[in-house]
Curated annotation (Swiss-Prot):
It is an enzyme of class 2 (transferase). The keyword Transferase applies. Keywords: ATP-binding, Carbohydrate metabolism, Glycogen biosynthesis, Glycogen metabolism, Nucleotide-binding, Nucleotidyltransferase, Transferase. It comes from Thermus thermophilus (strain ATCC 27634 / DSM 579 / HB8). The keyword Nucleotide-binding applies. One of its GO terms (molecular function) is glucose-1-phosphate adenylyltransferase activity. Pathway: Glycan biosynthesis; glycogen biosynthesis. This is Glucose-1-phosphate adenylyltransferase.
Length: 414
């Protein structure tokens, strides 16, 4: 195989149990987001926009929709050997050594595929999660990794100390070399010179290739290990004196974007997913999809334009402060502060507000829907209300989150 300078490996096998029922039939990275994308698209665009084109995507849990999405819509062609995005399912590649086991953790997923790293002989390996919403110039992080002569560089997100108890926290010296890793500490240690802020690990790493091999081979031999980068590999690297540095995500430059890079969301719960979706519909969104210098590619399904019809009395087709994909028809209804995916139809006299409707949802006449996530292929009968009586919603079998968001599962029949 052809040699590459930087090899990307994306961890996309997560079950995403806290996103159920959205993950009932799909992996977390395959969950739709932002009217036309899937969550995996954002990290893939980060690699491609950063000029890193040799990418493996490691899959495991309910990967069919994710597999189809990448195979159909993320193709470079067959003429450049160092340009590829290839899927790597869990396949017991080390069966003779490990026995009949799938990926046992984030580190083990890479360990079971070290032969792929060996084949390309990269200078550095970028190991990123496939389930976050963010923009990142990964090439800038790689250059920082080279400049510091690091064995490992960890992307870090500054958070208020009061919020840092939810994260793995990195303690650094004045050079931003990591001296300690705290897993969800009760008393997080602040950044030097910034007593109100702590450094949270984003779970994205750049490894010197030789260090990656050494650490993963040692971890695989450790029978007490959970084979996780944050819990096992990074603490081992610190104990054994590896050069481990933090990279300040806020200083990551995005072409076409002014100011610091502030937006990173782990949409690992239904409420977090909903909040990130609502971020998109603000007049000045926290996460801007409209940056021609940082294009966000995804499936091109050749949908027709969105359409708004009727303008008589209360029967007015309109959408306010919303994102609508191709093929949406708002026929005499009102959509407000919502995200509508492909081929959604909102019929006359209905109101949809602060909601997310996946592909092929149809809202009948005189419906009222608020604070809801409705998965694909749901036909809502006329005069139905969702999000107004939470006990009724629970009785229907819908999920109601701690923040009161109602989630209707894929293909639900009223």
């Amino acid at each position: 195989m052809v040699k590459v300078e930087v090899l990307g490996m994306i961890l996309a096998g997560g079950q995403g149990s806290r996103l159920y029922p959205l993950t009932a039939k799909r992996a977390k990275p395959a969950v739709p987001f932002g009217a036309k994308y899937r969550i995996i698209d954002f990290v893939l665009n980060n690699f491609v926009n950063s000029g890193i084109y040799a990418i493996y995507v490691l899959t495991q849990y309910k990967a069919q929709s994710l597999t189809e999405h990448i195979q159909r819509y993320w193709r470079f062609g067959a003429f450049l050997e160092d340009h590829f995005i290839l899927l790597v399912p869990a396949q017991m590649y080390r069966y003779e050594e490990l026995g009949p086991v799938w990926y046992r953790g984030t580190a083990d997923a890479i360990y079971q595929n070290l032969h792929l790293v060996h084949n390309h002989a990269p200078k550095a390996v970028a190991v990123f999660g496939g389930d976050h919403i963010f923009k990142m110039n990964i090439r800038h992080m790689v250059e920082y990794h080279y400049d510091t002569r690091a064995d490992i560089t960890i992307a870090a997100y500054p958070v208020p100390v009061a919020e840092a108890t939810r994260f793995g926290v990195l303690q650094v010296d004045e050079e931003w070399r990591i001296t300690e890793f705290q897993e969800k500490p009760e008393e997080p240690k602040p950044i030097p010179g910034r007593p109100d802020m702590a450094l949270a690990s984003m779970g994205n790493y750049i490894f010197r290739t030789e260090a990656l091999f050494e650490l993963l081979e040692a971890d695989a031999r450790d029978e007490t290990s959970a084979h996780d980068f944050g819990k096992d590999v990074i603490p081992r690297a610190l104990r054994e004196g590896y050069r481990v540095y933090a990279y300040d995500f806020h200083r990551n430059p995005i072409p076409g974007q002014e100011g610091p890079n502030l937006y990173w969301r782990d949409v690992g719960t239904l409420d977090a997913y909903y909040e990130a979706s609502m971020d998109l519909v603000k007049v000045v969104p926290e996460f801007d999809l409209f940056n021609p210098e940082w294009p966000l590619r995804t499936a091109n399904l050749f949908s027709p334009p969105a359409k708004f019809v009727h303008e008589t009395g209360e029967r007015v087709g309109r959408a306010l402060n919303s994102l609508l994909a191709g093929g949406v028809i708002v026929s005499g209804g009102t959509v407000r502060e919502s995200v509508l995916f492909r081929r959604v139809r909102v019929n006359s006299y209905s109101l949809v507000e602060r909601s997310v409707l996946f592909d092929d949802v149809e809202v009948g006449r005189y419906c009222r829907i608020r604070n809801a996530i409705i998965d694909k292929n749901v036909k809502i009968p006329p005069h139905t209300e969702i999000g107004y009586d939470l006990e009724l919603d629970r009785a229907r079998g819908f999920t109601v989150t701690p923040e009161g968001v109602v989630v209707v599962p894929k293909g639900y029949r009223f």
